[in-house]
């Protein structure tokens, strides 16, 4: 196999190996792509591709932490099935907390960060299944809470 291939083949192979849900590190992905004939691939390129396609680390059926792609690739929108991943939205006087399906928090936080300050969101911190939202102002936290809830058609 040639050492270099075109970008479409690389993307197709990258997506295919992530669907296997067995790669727990970026170096394992690099090795798999090199074994497929992409000799010019390196860790920084894999890192950029993981970010570009919204890959997240989640537990597979064997309970191992692995990289996988979300069902819908690209930047998610509120109209996509991502809203089905939100399980709970609650708040106190200073912060909004969103609970998600396991492995979905980073994907949803990415969407929330993209709407940002105009909708009252200063920033987010995401774990595996929990997102902390820092409102732009605690004076308008109730409005920000309603914005977040309406994005995901969530009602108590």
From Swiss-Prot:
Protein purpose: Regulates arginine biosynthesis genes.
GO CC terms, sorted: cytoplasm
The name this protein goes by in its record: Arginine repressor
Family: Belongs to the ArgR family.
Subcellular location: Cytoplasm
Designated gene of the protein: argR
A GO biological-process term: L-arginine biosynthetic process
Example GO molecular function: DNA-binding transcription factor activity
Species assigned in the record: Shewanella frigidimarina (strain NCIMB 400)
Keywords: Amino-acid biosynthesis, Arginine biosynthesis, Cytoplasm, DNA-binding, Repressor, Transcription, Transcription regulation
Pathway the protein takes part in: Amino-acid biosynthesis; L-arginine biosynthesis [regulation]
Pfam families xrefs: Arg_repressor, Arg_repressor_C
């Amino acid at each position: 196999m040639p050492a270099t291939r075109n970008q479409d083949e690389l993307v197709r192979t990258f997506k295919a190996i992530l669907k296997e849900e067995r790669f727990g590190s970026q170096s394992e992905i690099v090795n798999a792509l090199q074994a497929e004939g992409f000799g010019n691939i390196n860790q920084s390129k894999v890192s950029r591709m993981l970010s570009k396609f919204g890959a997240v680390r989640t537990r597979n059926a064997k309970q191992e932490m692995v990289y996988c792609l979300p069902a819908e690739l690209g930047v998610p929108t509120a109209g996509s099935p991502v809203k089905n991943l939100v399980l709970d939205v609650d708040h106190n006087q200073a912060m909004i907390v969103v609970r998600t399906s396991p492995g979905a928090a980073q994907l949803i936080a990415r969407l929330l960060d993209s709407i940002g300050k105009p909708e009252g969101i200063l920033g987010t911190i995401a774990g595996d299944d929990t997102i902390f939202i820092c409102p732009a102002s605690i004076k308008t936290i109730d409005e920000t809470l309603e914005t977040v809830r309406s994005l995901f058609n969530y009602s108590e």
